[in-house]
Amino acid sequence: MKSSKMECVRTLNQHNHVKTPPARRSFFSSTINGLLFPPNFPIRPKRLPSLRLSVRSSSSPQPQGSSTEHTTLLVETFHEHRRLKSLLKRLSKTGSCPLILLREDGDWSKEHFWAVVRFLRHASRFEEILQVFDLWKNIEKSRINELNYSKIIKVLGEEGLMEEAILSFKEMKSYGLNPTLEVYNSMIHGFGQKGNFADALVYLHEMREDNVAPETDTYDGLIEAYAKHKMYDEIGMCLKKMKLNGCPPDQITYNLLMRQFSKGGLLKRMESVYHTMISKRMHLQSSTLVAMLETYARFGIMDKMEKFYLRALNTKTPLGDDLIRKMAEVYIGNYMFSRLETLGVDLSTAFGETDLLWCLRLLSHSFLLSRQGMDSILQEMERENVPWNVTFANIILLTHLKMKDFTHLRISLSQLTHSVEPDIVTVGILFNAIDMGFDGTGTLEAWQRMELFYKAVEMNTDPVVITSFGKGNFLQNCELAFSTLEPEERVKKIWTYNNLINLVLKHKGSYGQ
């Protein structure tokens, strides 16, 4: 046994020369029974959209005046778009200054000005926003109005530029303009997001003195800010203040509360709000439904997870891949492997097939050690022209390894590189098999010829596969050896498979010891 392992390692470390790999076959044997790899499924071509030409009937000519106006509008729109494109191009140049550009142009339309503001936000040039606003509004005094100040204060608040927002707020009042509900909301929410709740509450008090009544949106922003800073007790106080000020929480507020309590892992509070909503016959938003489902999956409460999963399924609420993986982990943890098949089929029927859902269906039959079940899924994938990938391949390899079926493991490994490139999980499967007595010399030589070990390490297998089967000895040894390195050593070079394997050998003395 030991001599076989050392022979495999010697084969891996032979670097005399690299032969040109033989030409690959386009397809494997179509035999699936026995868990051989299916054919190299082609990617389905996308349909080209049909092109339709709209031909105007000559029997119904348009009025001459209407045609002329339409043409003029098109020309003006074209030139407006060209001027805006030119302005943004000048603004994107290194060292450009919007103040200089505005002076050069003389003035900008409101469309051009707000496009510049959006550009500056996207480019993180926040300090220039208020400067160019001051210059632009002074070119035409009618621009000093509540709407423009409301928009600029909202931008500043959203970007956390509260000192600039305060200046604009004071300047607005100095012009005799009355701050609107939107302006106060921007100030309160901006301070709240930064965690400065003292100032946020000052503006909440000031708006009431100015006879601007807070609305639920005002308090909703505060609630969201409290949750961001994990100040959940203050959320309760905020709700009481809402009710005392004649602004009872509405459906949006309750949905927000449930999402924030869910995110914070406050299960009892989340459920309490949910029961309140049920008693008030309020609608549960799809994002709230997903948040509740995520919470139950995170806590592993399977009965409630399934209850809200069925509700999401019935309402056609899409679920993200991460949530689907969490649900799969709950089923795996409870040894309910057949539910993975049901989960994959249900979601495929509702939203369409994905690689993750095919993966779950394969895993279901893999855990049940059902060759017939896996064959059935592989045949279905072949009929649907599902492109083959390393996740599917590794599930089959891991199943062979779990069964200690070295015959089919060898066949599958020999066919593997005809369709997909191995990743670190595949390499780990081979070394774990060698540790169990498998003769991996042929596979190591084949991978050496294709120069796999000189390539950067990649992890392309879906994480749910690792969760299902575990990391195995090889990956655990890799992590252990890697953790012994200094942080700068880990990032100073691109890690190849050779680098990583040699590190493991150096750390362990020899693999498998």
Per-region residue spans from a language model:
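Ankyrin-repeat interhelical turn/loop motif and analogous interhelical turns
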Residues: 161, 196, 231, 266, ...
